[in-house]
Amino acid sequence: DFDGLNLTWETLEGIAKHNGPLPLDEDGAIQAYSARHDLELDTWPGPEAQVAALADDIAYNNHDVDDGLRAGLFSVDDVSDVPLVGPVFAEVKAAYPDLDEHRLIHEAIRRMIGAVVEDVIVESRGRLADAGCQTGDEIRQLGRPVVSFSETMQAHDTDLKRFLFERMYRHYKVNRMASKARRVVRELFTLLVEEPQCLPGV
């Protein structure tokens, strides 16, 4: 008869520390919850949460490359010097020289996702074999992630994030829209607090 989310310990633990262990000495909602239902905040999460964290990273990076190109914040030529991204675009251009830009971007993004996922699979298999872990608890107690990019792919990921930060996240058009959005939300909040009859159903 429970009406709501019935989250297992593993789900809560994965949400709380999918990016790794959390400091125990900080005051926060997660630490307060963990004091009642120990989430073992000083250990790495189980393998599913580690996969989710990397999948999130892969999705964000590739989505942002796609968005940045389609919004005209940077061009295909601009990404030519970005490791992984540039070579993949060059590979697609060489294979399909007459491809229009929309399809070029789509195919390159698809291949980049494939390359990064393959890297994670190979690296993680090696780490699991080296660690000899058989259970999620053994993985939690290992003291390091087992689901990970290779060292080379981690460097590519860092380079891509740096490029996106400089060319997209700090782009004046993005900052202008973010500023407008903050203003709209602030004004809407003020209106609804001062005039609650504007809320639906009131």
Q: Predicted segments — roles?
A:
Residues 2-202:
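Histidine-centered, transition-metal-coordinating active-site segments
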